[in-house]
């Protein structure tokens, strides 16, 4: 017989060995022998079980298609379905909000509420659409995190096997507020085109009834965009506090004022919190390597005397704040007949090792005269 679609329910229970099909004598004998038994929910036939889902509207289940769920296992332990209902009732849960894969179980849960006489205090149900894979085909899973190199959990998924360890959004440098904002817009959209919300704005605007029924594609680039925006909007003192643990993990000794300056210079250029110390490492330690493509295009041996003169000139500057220093150096470059584009590009490479990053003279002012001169001198020596 084909048992692939077998349902232990109203249509089959009398052909099974249970308390309804056996005689009282047979039941007594089984009990006397200590035969293990489960407790099932008896689903009555011919019922239309209606659920008013806050997202999907009215959903109807036919009881003839439902199985008699096991509520208590043979070892006396309750199953999820029983424990879930009792727990929610005792905790006075008002709303059950969960993924759509649980929708099929809701009919059984409604029957349990009715059976216990708790229908008047039954919570409202809302079944969220699935979060789909980045390519939009199928539900996002832990395996997709490993496949695409993206987080799929809020926090790290621990494992005794290092190969199975999965860092979460927190470990990847996401701000909680950014993640909440991103997730809120998966399947829901406000009445206007606003994307960035404070928590209070989200509370006021969000509505379960306006969530789409269809699944939403997981767009990791969009998640990163939200994180960038939240970092950019955060005040610098708060950012400095977030940067500190990353700086300390790399044994960088930094004052609060210094970390605030790091936040000011880098917040428009980073995606994740750890980028302040990884991408912007050159604000904490000497440059590790120079962008050789730029050096090859811009550096010429005859520039060495010009840079030596520039080093002497910079050393003579008493006002080492950004704007005056920039004006003085650019005037010096112009008066000595040097090519500003080449000199400034090479100065940037000397200071940061890359053409990307904060303004040259902002970095110089932050790092101070001594460190600035050491970096330029080291760079020039490396080209000899």
Predicted regions and their residues:
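Active-site cores that bind ATP or allylic diphosphates and position pyrophosphate for catalysis
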Residues: 1-144, 151, 165, 190
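Catalytic adenosine-cofactor/nucleotide-binding cores of aminoacyl-tRNA synthetases and other
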Residues: 119, 124-290, 352-384
């Amino acid at each position: 017989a084909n048992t692939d679609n077998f349902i232990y329910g109203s249509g089959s229970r009398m052909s099974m060995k249970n308390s309804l099909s056996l005689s009282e004598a047979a039941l007594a004998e089984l009990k006397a022998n200590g035969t293990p038994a489960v407790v099932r929910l008896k689903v009555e036939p011919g019922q239309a079980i209606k659920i008013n889902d806050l997202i999907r509207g009215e959903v109807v289940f036919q009881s003839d298609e439902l199985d008699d769920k096991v509520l208590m296992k043979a070892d006396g332990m309750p199953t999820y379905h029983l424990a879930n209902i009792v727990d929610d009732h005792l905790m006075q849960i008002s709303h059950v909000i969960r993924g759509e894969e649980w929708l099929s179980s809701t009919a059984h849960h409604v029957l349990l509420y009715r059976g216990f006489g708790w229908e008047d205090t039954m919570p409202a149900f809302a079944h969220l659409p699935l979060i789909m894979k980045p390519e939009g085909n199928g539900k996002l899973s832990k395996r997709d995190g490993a496949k695409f190199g993206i987080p799929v959990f809020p926090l790290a998924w621990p494992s005794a096997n290092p190969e199975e360890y999965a860092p979460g959004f927190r470990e990847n440098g996401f701000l909680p507020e950014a993640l909440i904002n991103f997730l809120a817009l998966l399947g829901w959209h406000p009445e206007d085109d606003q994307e960035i919300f404070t928590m209070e704005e989200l509370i006021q605007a969000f509505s379960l009834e306006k969530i789409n029924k269809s699944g939403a594609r997981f767009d990791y680039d969009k998640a990163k965009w939200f994180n960038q925006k939240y970092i950019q909007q955060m005040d610098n003192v708060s950012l400095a506090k977030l940067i500190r643990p990353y700086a300390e993990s790399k044994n960088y000794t930094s004052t609060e004022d210094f970390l605030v300056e790091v936040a000011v210079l880098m917040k428009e250029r980073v995606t994740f919190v750890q980028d302040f110390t990884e991408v912007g490492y050159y604000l904490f330690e000497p440059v590790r390597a120079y962008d050789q493509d730029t050096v090859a295009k811009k550096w010429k041996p005859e520039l060495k005397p010009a840079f030596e003169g520039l080093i002497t000139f910079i050393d003579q500057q008493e006002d080492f704040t950004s704007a005056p220093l920039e004006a003085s150096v650019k005037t010096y470059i112009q008066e000595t007949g040097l090519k500003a584009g080449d000199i400034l590009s090479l100065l940037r490479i000397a200071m940061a090792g890359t053409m990307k990053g904060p303004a040259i003279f902002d970095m110089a002012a932050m790092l101070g005269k001594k460190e600035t001169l050491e970096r330029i001198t080291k760079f020039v020596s490396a080209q000899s």
